[in-house]
Regions:
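Surface-exposed, active-site-proximal loop segments in enzymatic domains
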Residues: 53, 82-99, 124-142, 330-336
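Aromatic-rich peripheral "rim/lid" segments of glycoside hydrolase catalytic domains that contact
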Residues: 296-357
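N-terminal export signals
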Residues: 5-25
Length: 357
């Protein structure tokens, strides 16, 4: 599908599927977003393309967009695996039916006033999660060429959609590679995007899995994304993928021997370095954060309140991982929560009100 066809389809859909504008109490306002100053977008990660399903991935759910908008949120980050729409034997061969699911999400975002943030969670040559990619994005030209090809395709496909409705988040949580290596890769991807759409808002995750700002990217005219998972003893208690089963039950503030990790620790170690980056003309957003469902609920909410207060003070938006699931406000399966029945889901009302506060 070319860009003109896509824009025609979404325009036609808008006639038949238009919904009344939803008053949005949390919606970011002010001037159009720029890489140097992002709106305080707030919302959730939606996981329909997070990993490739053997039987095929479903489209994004309109009910998610309606719920977010009704609650007053205005941001959806879509962490995606390139394998959802690519032949694993030919990374440059794209499957149009899967890509149309992304088109559908873009249109749902338009209808419900939700900004769409596309993210390659699994890119050709890199993913923070297993299994390991067959090539290494940081070393292999073939992987970098394929990754640039995918971003160029998205840039061309969605050219004309303004950046207040859509942004690109290049790579999820790059590891502790040398900064020069990361800058080289990001520069290549940004160049591929701008050859197709010079106006697209682009965001890069911080290094060391999103935790560290990257000053070497400040001259590229892109924003950066941080994380809200520190300390992981709180956010990932009993999470098997980080070997959290053996950790002691957390408190907040967290006691680590003679050290206490609290709100002021977060301010000093996780907020101030990024505020210093902002002084270089780089906008900041928290692309992921959340607390796994084994952490006691009272501890979870206390941790969330402190992070939210710090981000509000900094003027940063955020996207909770996730809307539905073990970190989310819906269907999280916590044992210490009295859930509310809500549109076919189990709602953690107390967490929702903390997020909306």
């Amino acid at each position: 599908m070319n860009r003109r066809d896509f824009l025609n389809i979404t325009a036609t859909a808008a006639v038949g599927l238009a919904v009344a504008p939803v008053p949005n109490a949390l919606a970011a306002d002010g001037p159009s977003p720029t890489a140097s100053h992002l709106p305080r977008w707030r919302g959730f990660n939606l996981l329909e393309k997070f990993t490739k399903w053997d039987k095929g991935n479903p489209p994004f759910q309109e009910s998610d967009f309606a719920i977010m908008a009704d609650w007053g949120f205005d941001f959806a980050r879509l962490p995606m695996s390139y394998l959802c729409w690519t032949d694993p034997e030919d990374w440059l061969k794209l499957r149009e039916p899967e890509l149309k699911h992304l088109d559908g999400a873009v249109e749902l975002g338009r209808q419900h006033g939700i900004h769409i943030n596309l993210n390659l969670h699994r890119a050709p040559g890199y993913c923070v999660n297993p299994p390991k990619e067959p090539l290494d994005l940081w070393k292999d030209e073939k992987a970098l060429e394929a990754c640039a090809f995918h971003w160029a395709h998205f840039a061309k496909r969605y050219k004309g959609i303004p950046s207040d409705r859509m942004s690109f988040d290049l790579l999820n949580e790059p590891p502790a590679v040398p900064e020069a290596t990361y800058v080289r890769v990001v520069t290549r991807l940004v160049e591929a995007i701008r050859q197709e759409d010079p106006k697209r808002l682009v965001i890069a995750d911080g290094l060391k899995w999103g935790g560290d700002p990257v000053r070497g990217l400040a001259g590229l005219g892109i924003a950066q994304s941080t994380r809200g998972y520190y300390p992981m003893q709180v956010t990932h208690y009993k999470a098997s993928w980080v070997r959290g089963e053996s950790w002691p039950e957390p408190t907040w503030p967290l006691k680590e021997g003679a050290k206490t990790v609290d709100k002021e620790t977060l301010r000093k170690e996780r907020i101030q370095p990024w505020r210093d980056l902002e002084k270089q003309g780089v906008g900041v957003h928290v692309g992921e954060w959340g607390v796994y469902n084994h952490t006691p609920h009272a501890v979870t909410l206390a941790f969330m309140r402190d992070n939210l207060a710090l981000w509000r003070e900094a003027g940063w938006g955020w996207a909770l991982w996730n809307l539905r699931g073990s970190f989310g406000v819906l269907d999280s399966q916590r044992e210490d929560v009295k859930y509310e029945d809500f549109r076919g889901h189990k709602l953690d009302r107390e967490m929702l009100e903390v997020l909306r506060g």
